[in-house]
Amino acid sequence: MSTEPDWMADVVFDADGLIPAIAQDAENGQILMVAWMNRESLAETAATGRAVYWSRSRKKLWRKGEESGHAQQVHELRLDCDGDVILLKVHQNGGIACHTGRASCFYRRLDGTSQRAAWVTVDPVLKDPELIYK
């Protein structure tokens, strides 16, 4: 007998048992980051109201903010029309979601056209990462 919640049956995980998860600021709509979740991290997120992801590089649960203090309180979980992407509407503690010390991981914008285009940093570092991760 499974202890998995009934709603989990609607979630489509990939062959590795993962689903992409987009974290969005619940107040202003800014996209903060994209990460991955597995069944365990999604269930823990839903149960606790705190964002928990799956770290593909470390192969373990990543409780957002456990090292940096920049946890995400989840206001709402949404599932897309195909059931294969999760959207988390969150409050970002400390206003920093990115390991680079920025509010969002999407801090570079493509400027220019075609062959002359280049990625330009458009958002400032709010806190030196060396002061965040000790």
UniProtKB/Swiss-Prot annotation:
GO cellular component, one term: cytoplasm
Cofactor binding mode and count: Binds 1 Mg(2+) ion per subunit. Binds 1 zinc ion per subunit.
Heme among keywords: no
Annotated protein name in UniProt: Phosphoribosyl-AMP cyclohydrolase
SUPFAM superfamilies assigned to the protein according to its UniProt record, in alphabetical order: HisI-like (SSF141734)
A molecular-function term among this protein's GO annotations: zinc ion binding
Enzyme class: hydrolase
Record's subcellular location: Cytoplasm
Native organism: Bordetella avium (strain 197N)
Pathway: Amino-acid biosynthesis; L-histidine biosynthesis; L-histidine from 5-phospho-alpha-D-ribose 1-diphosphate: step 3/9
Binding site for Mg(2+): D80, D82, D84
Gene Ontology BP terms: L-histidine biosynthetic process
InterPro entries reported in the protein's UniProt record: PRA-CH (IPR026660), PRib_AMP_CycHydrolase_dom (IPR002496), PRib_AMP_CycHydrolase_sf (IPR038019)
